[in-house]
């Protein structure tokens, strides 16, 4: 999973978005490829953010580049794009966008960029740090780590149930022998199984 660039733009509907700042992480590309990759990244980011409506969160896959451009534009016309590979989680990319917008406003009030008509480079030191931090979404985003732990737990439970079946034991047989289940619970399980079979035939 990779984040290739973070871009900030002034977006006015009907006009070409004005670049305010963009940072790149292109270490996975060869030295001679990086210039072209930067140009393509800027092009994809600008085109996608320019087609994003105010308040929308967009994740657009670009088949030619095999990248996903995640964008949003806030009510003041400040747009942010995060260009990632296709494996990068969209929710984490949009969390990164929100943080980038906040960091940009801390150092560049709206009055500083609102009147700009051509591309500039308004330095925002936090963008470089965020670009590096979010290369690993699991460590950067606590929810991602929680989701990973939950997925691992579900996998363990599935494996445990599959292993029971591999030993030739059916869950029904184990339930029938169990002292943990009352007569009513055993009857409920049998009834539920019959109902599921019945529904399966419909």
Swiss-Prot record:
Top EC class for this record: transferase
Cysteine methyl ester PTM sites in chain numbering: 199
Chain residues in the propeptide: 200-202
Keywords: Coiled coil, Cytoplasm, Cytoplasmic vesicle, Endosome, ER-Golgi transport, Golgi apparatus, Lipoprotein, Membrane, Methylation, Palmitate, Prenylation, Protein transport, Transferase, Transport
S-palmitoyl cysteine-type lipidated residues: 198
Membrane topology summary: Lipid-anchor
Lipidation (S-farnesyl cysteine): 199
Entry's Gene Ontology molecular function annotations: SNAP receptor activity; transferase activity
Family: Belongs to the synaptobrevin family.
Protein's recorded name: Putative synaptobrevin homolog YKT6
Gene label: ykt6
